[in-house]
């Protein structure tokens, strides 16, 4: 009975319940969009856009503008700007990400240093804070999750073509630039609604690790789209619970749990591959 009481103790607190709901939905959402991040070789995009959104969050705090409105517009504009610069091919996509996001992050730091009263809220954005999660965050992450699911379901074929063969997609009358812009906008919105719990410094890991783990379990694109969200949601759920009982940062615990899952899947996949190679050697 004591163990059961301790196990369910955090559920007595409203802030924990809010954080658990937001993080679990966010884990599934990041897992879903992370599939495209991994397959498109855009692992750096999550890291970059999280830094860009930080600039918007800092500006919103300083100007006392609604967080979702200010940081959301900033993040989406940054994503679209990256896509536009990259399409011109004057510089590569990685360079475009570096220029736009580091400039935005630097602006955020400058604002934070100039207006010290905003430092506490900015620190929460950087590292995440389950205490700052409100009911409004639940609505926000649920809305973005619904939009993300709608984009994937309605644009499944276009996303599939543009992800695996950009040239074939263009020949097939798929507006690749529009698809990429929508995807970047969705990633920006996902980062925005997830920052409260995970923080900007670790959000990119939540976009990459669950999808990378899922990628080692299947070669099917359709299976990836449900395996990755499951991994993301489960690790966020248990990570939140562990963080309370271990008295550790929620974001750090979630990412460490994701990393453990990745290591386990990697070890199992490696063992299976060696077994297959050994069986072929006996033929």
Please provide the spans of the model-predicted regions.
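Membrane-interfacial amphipathic/re-entrant helices at transmembrane-helix boundaries
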Residues: 1-28, 276, 282
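Transmembrane helix-bundle core of multi-pass membrane transporters
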Residues: 3-18, 89, 97-157
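Cytosolic-side transmembrane-helix boundaries in multi-pass membrane proteins
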Residues: 8, 248-283
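Loop-to-transmembrane alpha-helix initiation sites
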Residues: 19-22, 67-75, 94-98, 141-142, ...
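Short loop segments and helix-boundary regions at transmembrane helix junctions
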Residues: 35-118, 214-226, 243-246, 269-271
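Small-residue-rich segments of transmembrane alpha-helices in multi-pass membrane proteins
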Residues: 52-62, 100-111, 132, 176-186, ...
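Helix-loop-helix "hairpin" substructures at the membrane interface of multi-pass membrane proteins
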Residues: 137-210
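Transmembrane alpha-helical segments in multi-pass inner-membrane proteins
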Residues: 197, 201-252
């Amino acid at each position: 009975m004591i163990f059961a009481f301790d196990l369910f103790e955090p559920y007595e607190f409203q802030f924990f319940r809010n954080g658990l709901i937001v993080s679990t939905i966010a884990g599934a959402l990041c897992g879903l969009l992370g599939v495209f991040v991994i397959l498109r070789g855009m692992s750096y995009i999550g890291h970059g856009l999280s830094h860009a959104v930080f600039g918007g969050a800092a500006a919103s705090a300083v100007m006392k503008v609604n967080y979702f409105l200010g940081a959301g517009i900033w993040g989406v504009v940054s994503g679209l700007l990256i896509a536009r610069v990259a399409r011109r091919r004057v510089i590569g996509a990685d360079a475009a990400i570096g220029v736009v996001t580091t400039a935005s992050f630097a602006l955020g730091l400058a604002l934070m240093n100039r207006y010290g009263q905003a430092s506490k809220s900015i620190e929460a954005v950087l590292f995440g804070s389950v205490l700052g999660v409100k009911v409004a965050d639940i609505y926000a992450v649920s809305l973005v999750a619904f939009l993300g699911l709608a984009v994937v379901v309605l644009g499944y074929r276009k996303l599939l073509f543009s992800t695996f063969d950009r040239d074939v997609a263009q020949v097939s009358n798929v507006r690749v630039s529009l698809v990429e812009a929508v995807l970047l906008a969705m990633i920006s919105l996902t980062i925005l609604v997830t920052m409260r719990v995970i923080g900007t410094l670790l959000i990119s890991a939540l976009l990459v690790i669950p999808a990378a783990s899922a990628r080692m379990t299947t070669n099917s694109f359709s299976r990836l789209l449900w395996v990755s969200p499951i991994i993301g949601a489960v690790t966020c759920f248990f990570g939140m619970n562990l963080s309370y009982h271990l008295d550790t940062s929620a974001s750090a615990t979630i990412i460490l749990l994701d990393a453990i899952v990745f290591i386990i899947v990697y070890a199992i996949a490696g063992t299976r591959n060696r077994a297959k190679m050994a069986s072929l050697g006996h033929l």
